[in-house]
Amino acid sequence: INKIINGIPDWVYEEEFEYSRAFEWSPDSKKIAWCRFDESIVRTFAMSMFKGLRPELKEYATYPGIREWKYPKAGEDNSVVTVHVYDLNTRQTIRQDVGEESDQYIPRIRWTSDPEYLCIFRLNRLQNKLELLRTNYKTGESEVFYNEENKYYLDEKLFDSFTFLRNGKEMVFMSERDGWQHIYMLDLSSRNLHQVTSGQYDDAAILGIDEANRQVYFQAAKTSPLHREVCVTGLDGTGLKKLSVKEGTNDAGFSADFSYYVNTWSNANTPYLVTIHRSGGELVRVLEDNSRLKSILAEFRTTQKEFFTFTTTEGISLNGYMITPPDFSKNKKKKYPVYMTQYSGPASQSVSDSWSFGWENFLAQNGYIVVCVDGRGTGFRGEEFRKLTYLQLGKYETLDQIEAARYLGSLPYVDKNRIGIFGWSYGGFMV
């Protein structure tokens, strides 16, 4: 208890590396690889336990108790992680070589397209150096076949993009090597690296790889950080085409042979529209247009979400949205209170041209102007904008929210003495 975990990540890995399964079946289903987390050296956190109401813990009805968890903190000991493979035919377990260093992370394991070889992601404690190991599962011997370093840190959200093609010769993935999130392809034999997409915008996700036609489908914030387009390009970087038509946020899921895809679209003021298209973008049919929801919303006194930008005293342009009360008019002498909402966490995005409807709309109905501003440190504006907060969390994000409040206070229809701010999670830390 509280020492060894097999195949399920510990708290740090689940929370910070965003995965909950630490095992992988081989392509031929004859081997299973997993991570073993040894928490023996991790210090514990003791929590007082009481009876309570929901749930009611009757064992603590008379006397409170203590429950202990392994809870690593920054600068303290982490779990020691090792990687193992079990062969169902030989019934043998083989430990894989991840190097001598124990104070490191193994944020992912993934089988290559060859069931004889496992790929292990090895990340240093500072999270600025990533190495991909190729191990022969039978011997456990490993070699580094890809490495990447970053002057700030490597974003763990990109780790899931790494895909081994079925031909066994290439690997496609996303990286910030040129300062923007883009798609790359590695030749596994020559180790030559080829950049597939480029430009001063961020790709958001790889949606699928059509190996037969040598094409990759992806989601990009190409026209604006607020938008998402569905695009396709050749793996050689030629023939880039935008498939989505409507401005806003588009996402897609493809059929197994890439003949068709389901596109999900919305914008800030329109709920989801789900459609089927042929691979070239041609519309086949509408699956859901949310007409009933739109009719219901029309019965309420809702107002449109409007986007705006403003420039801070440091010359930084920031994006925001505003929801105004139903009786709002810039020409009136009336001044409105402002409710600012924000999250502001690293690489997050709250200001996007996508559908959402919550209690902020209710506040606007009751006379408040609701405003959200994405400051420095948020996503889809390039690496420099996103990672400016590195090693100084809370500094620039706070300054930008203060700048936003001052900007709002300068508007003729805002009551500058009645501006409040709310945040949740990281946003609560900001407040």
Which residue ranges define each predicted feature?
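Beta-strand C-termini and the immediately following turn/loop, strongest in propeller blades
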Residues: 21-24, 33-39, 73-77, 110-113, ...
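Serine-hydrolase catalytic core recognition
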Residues: 115, 242, 249-431
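Beta-propeller fold detector
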Residues: 1-2, 94-97, 142-149, 194-198, ...
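Predominantly five- to eight-bladed beta-propeller fold
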Residues: 1-23, 31-95, 280-295, 350-359
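Short glycine-/Asp-/Thr-/Trp-enriched loop segments that recur within the blades
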Residues: 2-19, 101-106, 151-159, 200-206, ...
